[in-house]
From Swiss-Prot:
Keywords: Nucleus, Phosphoprotein, Repeat, RNA-binding. This is RNA-binding region-containing protein 3. Residues 27-102, 419-502 form the RRM domain. One of its GO terms (biological process) is mRNA splicing, via spliceosome. Residues 115-130 have a biased composition (Basic and acidic residues). It holds the Pfam family RRM_1.
């Protein structure tokens, strides 16, 4: 064998460039924004796939990084490649393709070594032309040339997929979750087929083929495999036997596929529910008498009559007892002494008066209640149940030490005495009736003038929220209310009571001023 010819050393100016590129430079394309993930060989294969005759890949740095020059055999092929490559999305990058300018003519790519070897090989030129034509045919008539599938579609090719099952669907779901592009393409396909969007609630599970697979229709047996070395001497007989075997296997596969598709398209029949007739037995009187109460089966607890109704108390002879205290006995003794003194005095009167006094039941004197008099002396300020008592006020007040610790009472001053008091630091839940319950004890409601002068103004909104102005009958009542109610805790907050700064209310008569 002859040794292969060594390629001639190429000069720096690329001597063969004059034969490849015309003076206009319409056959050379400049491809920009190539993905950085591709190697130089992959970029060259990509551009040659679109009909490039020679490719020169530039460096990954500088102004022309990720670019390449591609030279095509003629202008028509270059225009066709430009229309197919321009704005093509490849690995997240959009290619920009344009014809090389005059200033780039100096950088026009030199033919690769592989092309020179092909030209210098012993194959004739006609074989190269036929191969190029076949390449163009495969590119134009391929299955998906944009995705790299350049071979034509086989007309005899048919797919035989099994019917869907739970495992197959689970594998598809796993693939959807792991490959985002596949998930997006499935959504596009559902949109094209006008299927409902899967973004709503979970839909009902359709009947699966594997759940309703009929048992009486098994799959047809597979054809026996042909022997590895058939004992046929002639080549023609071998070819004919192979063709017949392949045809028979294809026919069997088609029949098997049609049967599978028919079984997959069959709608499964739902099993009809078998109604069981319940024969009701006739109950006997003996059984009905011994039936347990239905209350035991109920969800609610058993209630006895004593839990619902008040039990009548047995009426008996009640013993009435009188407990007379020693004070009452002393009072009785005093009354008896008074009566005796009166009788002695009446004995000196004339008989007519004595007879008049003896007519009827005589005089009945009320018994003095010593406990009430003592309570009045001890607590002369106790009010009826409508108002608060002094004991409750004292219990509800905070001590002076606690007042010193609170910030509300630090700069406390009672103010100038008058008949109106100012209350602040009131809780949100305080109402006028609460203030009336506290400060009403300083008003005599039997007097009409005091009832008119008693006034409560509670601020519930605005800047004065939580404050109140209370008008009392006179300064004495106001001073007493300030002394006793200051620091009283109402709804968790101690009240701060002061004399109001406003002037005294103007009155026409001098008597009104005296009352204040």
């Amino acid at each position: 064998m002859a040794a292969p010819e060594q390629p001639l050393p190429m000069s720096r100016g690329c001597q063969n460039s004059s034969s490849l590129s015309p003076p206009r430079g319409d056959r050379t394309l400049l491809v920009r924004h190539l993905p950085a993930e591709l190697t130089a060989e992959e970029k060259e294969d990509l551009l040659k796939y679109f009909g490039a005759q020679s490719v020169r890949d530039l460096s990954d740095k500088g102004r022309l990084k990720h670019t390449a020059f591609a030279t095509f055999p003629n202008e028509k092929t270059a225009v066709k490649a430009l229309t197919r490559l321009h704005q093509l999305k490849l690995l997240g990058h959009t290619l920009v393709v344009e014809f090389a300018k005059e200033q780039d003519r100096v950088h026009s790519p030199c033919p690769s070594l592989g092309t020179e070897k092909k030209k210098r090989s012993d194959d004739p030129v006609e074989d190269d032309k036929e191969k190029k034509e076949l390449d163009c045919l495969t590119i134009e008539n391929g299955i998906a040339p944009n995705h790299g599938l350049t071979f034509p579609l086989n007309s005899c090719l048919k797919y035989m997929y099994p019917p869907p099952s739970s495992t197959i669907l689970a594998n598809i779901v796993n693939a959807l979750a792991s490959v985002p592009k596949f998930y997006v393409q499935v959504l596009h396909l559902m949109n094209k087929m006008n299927l409902p969007t899967p973004f709503g609630p979970i839909t009902t599970r359709p009947p699966m083929y594997e759940d309703y697979m009929p048992l009486h229709a098994p799959l047809p047996p597979t054809s026996p495999q042909p022997p590895e070395e058939p004992p046929l001497p002639d080549e023609d007989e071998e070819l004919s036997s192979k063709e017949s075997e392949y045809e028979s296997s294809d026919d069997e596969d088609r029949q098997r596929m049609t049967k599978l598709m028919e079984l997959a398209n069959l709608q499964p029949k739902r099993p009809k529910p078998i109604k069981q007739r319940h024969v009701r037995k006739k109950r006997k009187i003996k059984d009905m008498l011994n039936i347990p109460s239905s209350a035991s089966h109920s969800l609610h607890p058993v209630l006895l009559p004593s839990d619902v109704f008040d039990q009548p108390q047995p009426v008996g002879n009640k013993k009435i007892e009188f407990h007379i205290s020693t004070d009452m006995q002393v009072a009785f003794k005093k009354d008896l002494e008074k009566q005796q003194n009166c009788e002695e005095e009446n004995s000196d009167l004339p008989a007519t008066e004595a007879d008049a006094s003896n007519i009827g039941f005589g005089k009945i004197f009320p018994q003095p209640n010593l406990n009430i008099t003592e309570e009045i002396k001890d607590d002369s300020d106790e009010m009826p149940s409508e108002c608060i008592s002094r004991r409750e006020l004292e219990k509800g007040r905070i001590s002076r030490e606690e007042m010193e610790t609170l910030s509300v009472f630090r700069s406390y001053e009672p103010g100038e005495p008058n008949c109106r008091i100012y209350v602040k630091n009131l809780a949100k839940h305080v109402q006028e009736k609460d203030l009336k319950f506290i400060f009403g004890r300083y008003v005599d409601f039997s007097s009409e003038t005091q009832r008119i002068m008693f006034d409560i103004r509670l601020m519930k909104e605005g800047r004065m929220k939580g404050q109140a102005f209370i008008g009392l009958p006179n300064e004495k009542a106001a001073a007493k209310a300030l002394k006793e109610a200051n620091g009283y805790v109402l709804f968790g907050k101690p009240m701060v009571v002061q004399f109001a700064r406003s002037a005294r209310p103007k009155q026409d008569s001098k008597e009104g001023k005296r009352k204040c």
